[in-house]
C-alpha cells in the first residue's frame, strides 16, 4: 500500500458557486479557479496522484488548457481514479481536512462522503472529511480563501 498527501488553496470571490467535496454549498462567495476550484477534491487528487507517483493535478489538468475550464472536479477525480487503475492501483481510503472560517460544512459532509466514495469505488465510511477554522489568522482567517489538506491510501501492483 502507498500513501499520498495533497494540499490546495483558492481565493474566495463573489459571483462563483462554492463547491466543496463535490457538493455546492450556499454562499455569497465561491472559489476562484480554472475549474470549479473545489479545494477538497483538488487536494484529494494530488494525494492520490502522489501516492502512485503520477505527479499532480496541474500536470494532468493544466490551468492553461481550455479543455478544463469550468470542469467539475468530480469528473476530474474520475479521471484520476482511471489513471490509477491504468497503473494497477485502486483507492483504499482518504482523509480530507477543509480549513475555512465559514461556511460551516458539517451539514454537507454526508453528501460529500457519498459522492467521493462513489467515485473512488469505496464505502462512504472510507472517506473522512473534517473541517476546522484558522482561528481568524492568515488569509483563511481573514476569509480571503479556503484551504484543504488530504491524505489517501492506495493499493495494488
Curated annotation (Swiss-Prot):
First-level EC class: lyase
Chain positions recorded as a divalent metal cation binding sites: 8, 10, 42
Cofactor remark: Binds 1 divalent metal cation per subunit.
GO molecular function: 2-C-methyl-D-erythritol 2,4-cyclodiphosphate synthase activity; metal ion binding
Residue positions binding 4-CDP-2-C-methyl-D-erythritol 2-phosphate: 8-10, 34-35, 56-58, 132-135, 139, 142
E.C. number: 4.6.1.12
Domain of life: Bacteria
GO biological process: isopentenyl diphosphate biosynthetic process, methylerythritol 4-phosphate pathway; terpenoid biosynthetic process
Segments passing through the bilayer: none
Site (Transition state stabilizer): 34, 133
Cofactor(s) required for function per UniProt: a divalent metal cation
CDD domains with a match to the protein in the record: MECDP_synthase
Claim: Ubl conjugation is one of the keywords in the record: no
Catalytic activity, reaction form: 4-CDP-2-C-methyl-D-erythritol 2-phosphate = 2-C-methyl-D-erythritol 2,4-cyclic diphosphate + CMP
Pathway where it operates: Isoprenoid biosynthesis; isopentenyl diphosphate biosynthesis via DXP pathway; isopentenyl diphosphate from 1-deoxy-D-xylulose 5-phosphate: step 4/6
InterPro entries from the UniProt entry: MECDP_synthase, MECDP_synthase_CS, MECDP_synthase_sf
Gene3D superfamilies: 2-C-methyl-D-erythritol 2,4-cyclodiphosphate synthase (3.30.1330.50)
Keywords: Isoprene biosynthesis, Lyase, Metal-binding
KW Lyase (keyword) present: yes
Pfam family membership, one: YgbB
Record family assignment: Belongs to the IspF family.
Record note on quaternary structure: Homotrimer.
Primary role: Involved in the biosynthesis of isopentenyl diphosphate (IPP) and dimethylallyl diphosphate (DMAPP), two major building blocks of isoprenoid compounds. Catalyzes the conversion of 4-diphosphocytidyl-2-C-methyl-D-erythritol 2-phosphate (CDP-ME2P) to 2-C-methyl-D-erythritol 2,4-cyclodiphosphate (ME-CPP) with a corresponding release of cytidine 5-monophosphate (CMP).
Protein name per Swiss-Prot or TrEMBL: 2-C-methyl-D-erythritol 2,4-cyclodiphosphate synthase
Amino acid at each position: 500500500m502507498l500513501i499520498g498527501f495533497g494540499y490546495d488553496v483558492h481565493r474566495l470571490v463573489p459571483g462563483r458557486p462554492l463547491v466543496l467535496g463535490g457538493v455546492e454549498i450556499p454562499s455569497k462567495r465561491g472559489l476562484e479557479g480554472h475549474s470549479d476550484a473545489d479545494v477538497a477534491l483538488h487536494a484529494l487528487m494530488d494525494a492520490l496522484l502522489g501516492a502512485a507517483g503520477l505527479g499532480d493535478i496541474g500536470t494532468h489538468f493544466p490551468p492553461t488548457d481550455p479543455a478544463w475550464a469550468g470542469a467539475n472536479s468530480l469528473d476530474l477525480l474520475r479521471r484520476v481514479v482511471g489513471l490509477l487503475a491504468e497503473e494497477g492501483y485502486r483507492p483504499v481510503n482518504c482523509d480530507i481536512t477543509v480549513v475555512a472560517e465559514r461556511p460551516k460544512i458539517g451539514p454537507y459532509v454526508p453528501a460529500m462522503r457519498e459522492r467521493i466514495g462513489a467515485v473512488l469505488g469505496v464505502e462512504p465510511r472510507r472517506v473522512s472529511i473534517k473541517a476546522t477554522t484558522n482561528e481568524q489568522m492568515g488569509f483563511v482567517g481573514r476569509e480571503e480563501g479556503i484551504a484543504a489538506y488530504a491524505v489517501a491510501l492506495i493499493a495494488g501492483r
